[in-house]
Amino acid sequence: MNKKLILALVLITSCFIAEAQYFTGFSIKSYRISSVWPTSFRSLRGSVTASIGNTGDTRKMSGITAKVYRNGKPFAQGVCEDVTFNKGTSTYTLNGEVKLSDGVSTWDAIAAALSFRVSEYTIDFTVNIKHPDGKMDYVVRAGMPLSHYLRR
């Protein structure tokens, strides 16, 4: 079961990192899972270390959430702690938590891990972006196929 939650953490974090490339001035140089530890049978916390280039001004991203759907049904949801991206290329640690959705049992997660097909998964993603001038953007990406992020 922990393998499936690790997969969900990787998916959500990878999507956040991949989605960041769509914000003007961001480029992802590299990323890796730094740590993963279970918080229960249905959730885990973890961190990803990423090298991110930002050619724009410093921006703070908050309210970072993602929901993973399997065959159109809620499967897992995750949140990432707020992060500030400074101008230039720097290494950041992104911390987050992933939980299985209500109605998804540990056995469902194990079965999904054993029969994983990328075509079965879609992701909703939201983030608030605060610019140096105080302007806030609320970004929503809904129903994006997981394959969209894995091709990057």
Features from the language model and the residues they span:
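Sec-dependent N-terminal signal peptides
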Residues: 5-14
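Sec/Tat signal peptide C-region and signal peptidase I cleavage site
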Residues: 16-20
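Low-complexity, acidic Ser/Thr/Pro/Gly-rich terminal tails and inter-domain linkers that flank the onset
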Residues: 21-44
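Asparagine-centered strand-capping/turn motif at beta-strand->loop junctions
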Residues: 52-58
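Conserved aromatic beta-strand anchor motif in extracellular beta-sandwich/beta-rich domains
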Residues: 68-70
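Intrinsically disordered, low-complexity Pro/Gly/Ser/Thr-rich segments with frequent PxxP/GP/PP motifs
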Residues: 72-108
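Terminal connector regions
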Residues: 101-152
